[in-house]
Amino acid sequence: MTSEPQQFASDNYSGICPEAWAAMEEANHGHAPAYGDDLWTARASDAFRTLFETDCEVFFAFNGTAANSLALASLCQSYHSVICSDAAHVETDECGAPEFFSNGSKLLVAPSAGGKLTPEAIRAIATARSDIHFPNPRVVTV
């Protein structure tokens, strides 16, 4: 008998924890308004506000690629760029989604040791050019 090896490349490879499944089962009874105007979304949003101790907006996404891409898109315009390491997840595993959802914001890749950016590497990219034809650095991923 052979068993399938566990995969750790994505949180989409396995089921959810029993506590989350139980909460979803509890929410799956009765009726509630759709599109975020419901008690469940309000409770979850309030939990984030409590956790981060700030009055923040909460946007739910269906997976990590969507979350990463939409977060970067909310920070960048098409003429901006995102500085990341050569091993950054947004560079190696998002298949162009951050650029697509940000209307073309460019990923500017810095060489790194073990995927860690240095202040010098960030500075080198951020100050390389300042002309209109270069995407202005706006975000650094860590």
Segments (PLM) and residue ranges:
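PLP-dependent aminotransferase-class I/II
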Residues: S102-V142
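Conserved PLP-anchoring active-site segment centered on the Schiff-base-forming lysine
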Residues: S74-T92
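Solvent-exposed alpha-helices and their adjacent loops that cap or buttress functional pockets
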Residues: T50-E53, S74-L75, V90, E99-S102, ...
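Structural motif
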Residues: Q6-Q7, C56-F60, H80-V82, K106-L107, ...
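Conserved N-terminal alpha-helix of the aminotransferase class I/II PLP-enzyme fold
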Residues: C17-G64, D86-A87, T92, A97
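Conserved core of the PLP fold type I
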Residues: C56-C76, V109-S112
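N-terminal amphipathic/basic leader segments beginning at the initiator methionine
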Residues: M1-A23
